[in-house]
């Protein structure tokens, strides 16, 4: 019998969203071969991420999080399949964790890369193509470099691509799959809004000058 380590089981679980015991059994049946184990789970219909993704997740909850000092706030809609699950501890914990994640990620604007508008991608490409370090390079090489940079940049904008703040060895997407496997339902991050106190408000110059004058007089 092959040596099935906890690390190997965790890796398979992160990939598939299947339960811990199912992952261990899959690794035993496949002689600890990761790809064969994934295939085994799919054949048995246990690969949660694949099996549940086609089911409608129309229930759920809207969660909120206000960071210490009340300077950052988050509203998040997380969907599941049943109201029963939405009230459960695992679901509510995930809702809270993802809300905190959003609060900690000021650059994140979209749920997934697929949600990013083409205009944003085109703008990033235009910026990258004009960088000085690419001047003089052949077009084919330039395109390859730019494609890699854009891919990285778009992932920075997508919530599910971010390392989970409480366990940076997994992404938010993998976290959702793990909890979906534990709950036994399809889970989906639908949308979110992040608020920052004073965002978009320009400080009046006269007020700023008065502040400086006040400090100088002390």
From Swiss-Prot:
Region (Involved in Mg(2+) ion dislocation from EF-Tu): 82-85
Key words of the record: Cytoplasm, Elongation factor, Protein biosynthesis
Localization: Cytoplasm
GO cellular component: cytoplasm
Keyword Protein biosynthesis: yes
Top-level taxonomic group: Bacteria
Tagged with keyword Protein biosynthesis: yes
Major location category of this protein: cytoplasm
One annotated GO molecular function: translation elongation factor activity
Pfam family, one: EF_TS
Family: Belongs to the EF-Ts family.
Biological role stated in the UniProt entry: Associates with the EF-Tu.GDP complex and induces the exchange of GDP to GTP. It remains bound to the aminoacyl-tRNA.EF-Tu.GTP complex up to the GTP hydrolysis stage on the ribosome.
PANTHER family with a match to the protein in the record: ELONGATION FACTOR TS, POLYPROTEIN OF EF-TS, CHLOROPLASTIC
Protein name as annotated: Elongation factor Ts
Organism of derivation: Prochlorococcus marinus (strain MIT 9211)
Gene: tsf
